[in-house]
Amino acid sequence: MSKQLIYSGKAKDIYTTEDENLIISTYKDQATAFNGVKKEQIAGKGVLNNQISSFIFEKLNAAGVATHFVEKLSDTEQLNKKVKIIPLEVVLRNYTAGSFSKRFGVDEGIALETPIVEFYYKNDDLDDPFINDEHVKFLQIADDQQIAYLKEETRRINELLKVWFAEIGLKLIDFKLEFGFDKDGKIILADEFSPDNCRLWDADGNHMDKDVFRRGLGELTDVYEIVWEKLQELK
């Protein structure tokens, strides 16, 4: 399958394929935090992220969630549907943590009575600012119907993920999703789902996600390997 690099990101390289509606996503060993301010090459990270994300997306597909995932091609590659990415990071929070705790001056780990969905404008120059529905419409990113769908679909995905992670003894604190328009103009889940873009805590409150790298709490791949081993118990 011939391929040409069309985009190089912090965590993945994206390549064309012979089918104009399909792309290959290649996962890198690079770890970044604070919008790329902190970065490091960590051997084995790309393989683990691809394994975890492929596994989660396969389960989401089977549960009826429309995603860009087609198949895992190799240790670091997966075949995806080509989408036009919506420039929003859709964050869902089940518990207080991270920037939410800092913004509102509250402790981490407080259960939210109703999960909170937040939007962040994907713009590196602006440092991905926190925005609301009215900003989304002003920027012509999405209309009312599309905004409602993004929130509803994110909440539906959350209900699935919470159950799966609870089954393996992990608490889903929060996560970030990205969506895009497929060739038919339908909004589908894109990007990835791995400990890079979610927070997972074990029963003792230990971080099982990229906060290990952000906060210098230990070896990133050791933690990701534990998450991957636990996920395989769901098979």
Curated annotation (Swiss-Prot):
Pathway: Purine metabolism; IMP biosynthesis via de novo pathway; 5-amino-1-(5-phospho-D-ribosyl)imidazole-4-carboxamide from 5-amino-1-(5-phospho-D-ribosyl)imidazole-4-carboxylate: step 1/2. SUPFAM superfamilies: SAICAR synthase-like (SSF56104). It is an enzyme of class 6 (ligase). Keywords: ATP-binding, Ligase, Nucleotide-binding, Purine biosynthesis. Its EC number is 6.3.2.6. Disulfide bonds: none annotated. The keyword ATP-binding applies. InterPro entries: SAICAR_synt/ADE2_N, SAICAR_synt_PurC, SAICAR_synth, SAICAR_synthetase, SAICAR_synthetase_CS. It catalyses: 5-amino-1-(5-phospho-D-ribosyl)imidazole-4-carboxylate + L-aspartate + ATP = (2S)-2-[5-amino-1-(5-phospho-beta-D-ribosyl)imidazole-4-carboxamido]succinate + ADP + phosphate + 2 H(+). GO terms for molecular function: ATP binding; phosphoribosylaminoimidazolesuccinocarboxamide synthase activity. The keyword Ligase applies. GO terms for biological process: 'de novo' IMP biosynthetic process; cobalamin biosynthetic process. HAMAP family: SAICAR_synth. Belongs to the SAICAR synthetase family. This is Phosphoribosylaminoimidazole-succinocarboxamide synthase. It comes from Streptococcus pneumoniae (strain Hungary19A-6). The lineage of its organism: Bacteria, Bacillati, Bacillota, Bacilli, Lactobacillales.
